[in-house]
Amino acid sequence: MENKRKQKDEIVLVNGSNDTTPNKKQKNELQVVSSGGGREIILGTERTSKLEHPIMQLIGHKGEIYSCKFNSYGTALASGGSDKEIFLWNVYGECINYSVLKGHKGTILELHWSTDSNEIYTACTDKSIGVWDSNKGELIKRIREHSGVVNSCCPARRGPPLVASGSDDRSARIFDTRSKGSTHLFQHKYPVTSVCFSDASDQLITGGIDNVIRVWDIRNQEDPLYTLASHQDTITSTSVSKDGAYLLSNSMDNSCKIWDIRPYAPPNRNIKTFNGAQNNFEKNLIKSSWSIDGRRIGCGSSDRQVYIWDTNTKQLQYCLPGHSGTVNEVTFHPNEPIIASCSSDKTIYLGEIKP
């Protein structure tokens, strides 16, 4: 075929070893990346990050993806879902899928990196919590103390290597990964769908299908310090801001809320509510997250969009299309204006936004 000059808006499709890739990549290219080697390139966007292209689509999972997180350095992304595997991806360059961690026997519902990024923790429907060596790609420990699906897990930011978990068995537990057995047990009347630690790691925050968020002093496993009861449906995620002052929650009532969890805060701790993101009949545990500076929050949605709000003005800054299935998690890069989103459509997007 006679070569023709490529137009600015042309899409170049390259599969495998096909040699039609342009020799010089433009600064403003967008790229779709597959772990199988194929990619598409679209031209025409102003750059704000060190991503190789403004939008990168990561393909390789064989099932729905329910969780994705950047490591603390922002150089790697971990993802997990219904194919029972954890994929590790390079964030920069060609976004290569450099490792696949296998060992779970059920769907991975949530994952987190340790603070030093040397370990990954996973919550799974096989009733276990996995502790993985992210460098060797090996399973270090499988914790089996729950009698039901483990919906959520979260490592402590400070102190000993503690990991919290929440389960359909109506309990939340805390484990020290250096020892056997749980160190703390928090009984609930209903399944626990989300857990997270306070910034100081001296409190555990739990949410469940009774629509209530409970804040526990980990030294007192009998009764919570206080409860946060403003959501009208199941709590699907909880996360604490970087400064430890605020809690972000997401719910099946189609709202995200910010709570003041500082000591001596007024009784009505719900200070802001963000509407727009949806949760439909699938009833997925859709997750929300903070940007590292706390100026933005992001949330997945069953309407296949990525939602990002300004936390000061409550203004919706972005409603981003692209996925063809429910967006189950949105997470922010620790150093750059980059977001990652994972979906039931088996794909992940990395995209840069304005600083």
Swiss-Prot record:
Compartments in which it is found: Nucleus
GO biological process terms on file: mRNA processing; RNA splicing
Sorted UniProt keywords: mRNA processing, mRNA splicing, Nucleus, Repeat, Spliceosome, WD repeat
Renumbered ranges of WD repeats: 60-99, 103-142, 145-185, 187-226, 230-269, 280-319, 322-355
UniProt KW Kinase keyword: no
InterPro entries in the record: G-protein_beta_WD-40_rep, U5_snRNP_Component, WD40/YVTN_repeat-like_dom_sf, WD40_repeat_CS, WD40_repeat_dom_sf, WD40_rpt
Entry GO CC: catalytic step 2 spliceosome; nucleus
Record flagged with keyword Nucleus: yes
Disulfide-bond pairs as recorded: none
Pfam families: WD40 (PF00400)
Superkingdom assignment: Eukaryota
Described function: Required for pre-mRNA splicing as component of the activated spliceosome. Component of the U5 small nuclear ribonucleoprotein (snRNP) complex and the U4/U6-U5 tri-snRNP complex, building blocks of the spliceosome.
PANTHER family: U5 SMALL NUCLEAR RIBONUCLEOPROTEIN 40 KDA PROTEIN
Protein name: U5 small nuclear ribonucleoprotein 40 kDa protein
Organism name: Dictyostelium discoideum
